């Protein structure tokens, strides 16, 4: 028996679906197997999944847990090939995969430039974008009378907001959209993943070079200006890497959040009625959606820097740990016996959908702002909005990370 077999003997196990065909079903199976589950990823790579809210919350705050992939034992032993399908999600160097002083250095400049004030300044532009997209929805009606809300609202809202935020010129945006679509896919061939990484990096590098010459009122220009005032803060490559992190997380999370919220409301008419009651329940809709149907179902990885015990199970030093946000979002031990229900009136909604601790998502306030504006205005403009297809037939995004559907056909009804 190998050391790995000895450490996992008798431990619950689950093979995760790289296609993400059933995030919530898989999340339920994780919870059924116990708080700590050994999981198999594509390429027969093994990791751990901690499927209980309180335990995952403790882990992300534990100083013995690292985000740095250099602490992944299998990676250091040469057991993870460069063409592993998920390598692009893991083997990167940025503020998400850094610890300690290095993490503080990488995050400091972003925290100074991507402020609450800058997010609030995006409110009028976000409102303008949403209004324009809502105006155009009837023109996108298909022959069967439906409109794909993912394609024509949920997708372009964060894409346009982030493009404006970064100062990305119009002529670069079509290529950006094509590249972003592939970032969270876990069903692509390794060579496609690698080529896409290069493409999106080169595009953002061009944006940084442009804003270095032509400053604007955008985050990229602000980062470059701050970097010039403090040269040791970030290298030019790190500025590009920072933009890539914010783009990857900011777009996909907000897109899926809007889609999941609309789908939840249209399949829970009592909750939709409550949301439209006039008491401004839209922020509560956003928070309950983040808990009940987290936009990111699973998120890699953390690594113990020593053997740790979690719920009576030893996770060896250097083993990767997955954060299963879909699973912990419906953890009855945290959210009560009705954790599986969608209830926007739920008190004290506490979720981990945006992470927690020093690595919590910097873009969470912007995602909340975009989603709240989009939802409030959508249902005010189209109060009779209804689903245009059986919700059980909507195909999932092919990703073990992103949790959403590839289309959201709706019938608009009368315009208010």
Regions found by a protein language model. Name each.
Residues 1-416:
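Cytochrome P450
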């Amino acid at each position: 028996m190998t050391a790995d077999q000895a450490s996992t003997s008798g431990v619950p196990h689950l093979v995760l679906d790289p296609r993400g065909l059933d995030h919530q079903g898989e999340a339920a199976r994780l919870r059924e197997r116990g708080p700590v589950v050994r999981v198999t990823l594509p390429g027969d790579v093994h990791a751990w999944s901690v499927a209980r809210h309180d335990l995952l919350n403790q882990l992300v705050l534990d100083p013995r847990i690292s985000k740095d992939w250099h602490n992944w034992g299998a990676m250091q032993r040469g057991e993870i090939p460069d063409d592993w399908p998920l390598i692009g999600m893991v083997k990167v160097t940025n503020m998400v995969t850094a610890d300690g002083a290095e993490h503080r250095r990488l995050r400091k400049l972003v925290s100074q430039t991507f402020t609450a004030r800058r997010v609030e300044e995006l409110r009028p532009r976000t409102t303008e974008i949403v209004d324009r997209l809502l105006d155009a929805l009837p023109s996108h009606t298909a022959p069967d009378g439906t409109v794909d809300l993912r394609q024509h609202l949920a997708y372009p809202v964060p894409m346009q907001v982030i493009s404006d935020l970064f100062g990305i010129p119009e002529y670069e945006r079509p290529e950006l959209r094509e590249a972003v679509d592939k970032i969270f896919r876990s069903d692509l061939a390794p060579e496609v993943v690698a080529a896409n990484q290069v493409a999106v990096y080169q595009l953002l590098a061009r944006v940084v070079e442009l804003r270095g010459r032509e400053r604007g009122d955008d985050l990229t220009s602000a980062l470059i200006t701050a970097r010039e005032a403090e040269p040791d803060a970030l290298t030019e490559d790190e500025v590009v890497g920072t933009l890539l992190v914010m783009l990857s997380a900011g777009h996909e999370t907000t897109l899926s959040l809007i889609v999941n919220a609309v789908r939840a409301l249209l399949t829970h008419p009592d909750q939709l009625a409550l949301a439209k009651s006039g008491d401004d329940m839209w922020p509560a809709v956003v928070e309950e959606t983040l808990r009940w149907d987290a936009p990111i179902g699973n998120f890699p990885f953390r690594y113990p820097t020593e053997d740790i015990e979690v719920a009576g199970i030893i996770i060896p030093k250097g083993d990767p740990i997955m954060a299963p946000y879909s699973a912990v979002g419906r953890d009855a031990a945290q959210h009560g016996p009705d954790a599986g229900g969608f209830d926007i009136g739920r008190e004290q909604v506490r979720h981990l959908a945006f992470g927690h601790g020093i690595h919590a998502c910097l873009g969470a306030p912007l995602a909340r702002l975009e989603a709240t504006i989009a939802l409030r205005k959508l249902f005010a403009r189209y109060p009779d909005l209804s689903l245009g297809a059986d919700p059980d037939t909507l195909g999932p995004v092919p990703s073990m990370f992103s949790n959403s559907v590839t289309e959201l056909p709706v019938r608009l009804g009368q315009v208010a």
